[in-house]
């Protein structure tokens, strides 16, 4: 999440379309261990694996990815009834995947989180990250 917010800077002067997502699906093992949702956790659902918590969301995320592969647009062939995945842009919104497939939708970045990420982008070189 942090890297996605910080990496917005290369697109400020480019014409690239930027789209963001947040896979916020906590599986039982990670919840018990305290890991939370790990980086690239959605990959298993995209490629046909995943946990019981992820299975209801798999057709939705697969629809976006296969649509992008087919048409270079995640919305063209997305799963019927799923929300439009909008461009990041000035609204700073991203497609959010919570544990409930009926609540998948666009959400804005929390201003506090953006402030923390901006701070980290300033000190990142100092702390070696």
Protein language model annotation of sequence segments:
Residues 1-129:
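C-terminal helix-and-tail extensions that cap enzymatic domains
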């Amino acid at each position: 999440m942090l890297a996605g917010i910080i990496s917005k800077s290369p697109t400020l002067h480019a014409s690239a379309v930027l789209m963001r997502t947040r896979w916020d699906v906590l599986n039982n093992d990670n919840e018990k261990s305290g890991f939370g949702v790990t980086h690239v956790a959605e990959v298993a659902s995209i490629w046909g694996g995943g946990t019981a918590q992820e299975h209801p969301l798999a057709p939705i995320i697969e629809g976006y990815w296969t649509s992008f592969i087919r048409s270079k647009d995640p919305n063209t062939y997305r799963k019927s009834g799923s929300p439009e995945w909008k461009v990041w842009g000035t609204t700073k919104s991203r497609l959010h995947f919570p544990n409930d497939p009926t609540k998948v939708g666009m959400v804005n970045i929390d201003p506090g989180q953006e402030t923390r990420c901006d701070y980290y982008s300033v000190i990142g070189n100092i702390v070696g990250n």
